[in-house]
């Protein structure tokens, strides 16, 4: 039940101090949610166990996740979120099939969110080519890892960036 999240957004928007401020809603990206579902633990060591043993299951789960994530986006926007961030903690684990597991699922969410009139921030953590990601997925803004050179990236994309600093 995610209704406490939506109620919090409503309450924040009603707050006198925040009534004219943007509120960033948050969703996990399909790939990251899939990693947690199948791996059952955080892949902190960079390993995903038995992940591609059933491609049909993975594809079905991605479709289901797309539907549920869009509902979560819609409910956050309806409650008053003015920006949505798609956080993909484990996108750096994708070694091939970027279209299938990273670009297309994220693009679906970005297009849906933009159709609601809301800008989208993406953070595909750990990927090697932020320029390519931005060209395909077209987020309103992108968060970058601390090891990405922001000046270099800005030569290749035309959207705001955030991050690029070592924690």
Please name every model-derived segment.
Residues 3-167:
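Active-site loop segments of alpha/beta catalytic cores
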């Amino acid at each position: 039940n995610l209704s406490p999240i939506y109620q919090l957004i409503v309450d924040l928007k009603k707050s006198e101090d925040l009534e004219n401020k943007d509120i960033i809603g948050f969703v996990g990206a399909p790939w990251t949610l899939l990693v947690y579902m199948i791996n059952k633990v955080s892949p902190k060591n960079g390993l995903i166990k038995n992940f591609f043993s059933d491609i049909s299951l993975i594809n079905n789960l991605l479709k289901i996740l797309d539907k549920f994530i869009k509902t979560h986006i819609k409910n956050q926007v309806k409650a008053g979120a003015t920006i949505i961030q798609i956080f993909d903690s484990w996108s750096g684990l994708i070694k091939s099939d970027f279209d299938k597991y990273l670009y297309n699922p994220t693009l679906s969410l970005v297009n849906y969110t933009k159709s609601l009139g809301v800008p989208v921030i993406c953070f595909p953590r750990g990927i090697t080519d932020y320029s390519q990601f931005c060209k395909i997925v077209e987020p309103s803004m992108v968060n970058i890892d601390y090891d990405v050179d922001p000046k270099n990236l800005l030569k290749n994309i035309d959207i705001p960036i955030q991050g690029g600093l070592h924690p």
